[in-house]
Curated annotation (Swiss-Prot):
Record-annotated disulphide pairs: C41-C115
Gene Ontology CC annotation, any one: extracellular region
Function: V region of the variable domain of immunoglobulin light chains that participates in the antigen recognition. Immunoglobulins, also known as antibodies, are membrane-bound or secreted glycoproteins produced by B lymphocytes. In the recognition phase of humoral immunity, the membrane-bound immunoglobulins serve as receptors which, upon binding of a specific antigen, trigger the clonal expansion and differentiation of B lymphocytes into immunoglobulins-secreting plasma cells.
Ranges for domain Ig-like: 21-123
Region annotation (Framework-2) ranges: 54-70
Gene that this polypeptide is encoded by: IGLV5-39
Protein's name according to its UniProt entry: Immunoglobulin lambda variable 5-39
Region ranges (Complementarity-determining-2): 71-77
Gene3D superfamilies for this protein: Immunoglobulins
Length: 123
């Protein structure tokens, strides 16, 4: 089987109600099957990643977005129905970013990935 890189695309940015970029994501990421991928969703200055739930979605051409997971902390997270455990969430406080980690990449993971945030005052 020939080596084929996976191209995983990300939404370049999301806008908030004030029409200022709130979240930024790299435009694309390429990785090999079997490798791991790490997607970042960086919140703008003044928005603390620690107080937000980060939601991740996957969208393939011609399909609706699929909910993958929600992550705020190790004690406040949720995996989407039927989503394999090789998809996981995390945060990097030093860069004020939410992370989507995919281990053991498969060809079926080639898709667009989107993040969204929701404020949560609960611990």
């Amino acid at each position: 089987m020939a080596w084929t890189p996976l191209l995983l695309l990300l939404l370049s940015h999301c806008t908030g109600s004030l029409s200022q970029p709130v979240l930024t994501q790299p435009t694309s990421l390429s990785a090999s099957p079997g490798a791991s991928a790490r997607f970042t969703c960086t919140l703008r200055s003044g928005i603390n990643v620690g107080t937000y739930r980060i939601y991740w979605y996957q969208q393939k051409p011609g399909s609706l977005p699929r909910y993958l997971l929600r992550y705020k902390s190790d004690s406040d997270k949720q995996q989407g129905s039927g989503v394999p455990s090789r998809f996981s969430g995390s945060k990097d406080a030093s860069t004020n970013a939410g992370l989507l980690l995919i281990s053991g990449l498969q060809s079926e993971d080639e898709a667009d990935y989107y993040c969204a945030i929701w404020y949560s005052s609960t611990s």
